[in-house]
């Protein structure tokens, strides 16, 4: 049985991520989407919120599970019996980064096999960070996210804006 893991912060999960998940689910017997924490990023959603969002987005994919963990991806792979580490790349910069991560993972565990998927050209410009930035500036990103995640992002954006306005009002006093 071919088991793969697709780790990421998914804050939020985009249609680019979902496309990779669908493609991976067609290739592997089982695909575990691992919602991880990236300490270098400012998360809008908690890990539990992201897990719930991703579960809803992949509900129709019977061979896909959604998990979470902390620590090294290679340790998680060993824990769940994953043979392959699935990654997506949008451009040359992503490839260079993923190549280095793959080399480190192989150093940590020489059984780790990284499979790199090229992003569908219609999603090559997408990143969670870019979508959050566009949303904060009032841009319409609904067509780039699963519907459930767009709703959650819009609600979170309103909450963040209300906090900002409240803070500005308090500072003005």
From Swiss-Prot:
Site feature location: Transition state stabilizer: 17
GO BP annotations, alphabetical order: coenzyme A biosynthetic process
EC number: 2.7.7.3
First-level EC class: transferase
Cell location: Cytoplasm
Alphabetized InterPro entries for the sequence: Cyt_trans-like, PPAT, Rossmann-like_a/b/a_fold
Binding partners and assembly: Homohexamer.
Full protein name: Phosphopantetheine adenylyltransferase
Organism (species): Limosilactobacillus fermentum (strain NBRC 3956 / LMG 18251)
Gene responsible for this protein: coaD
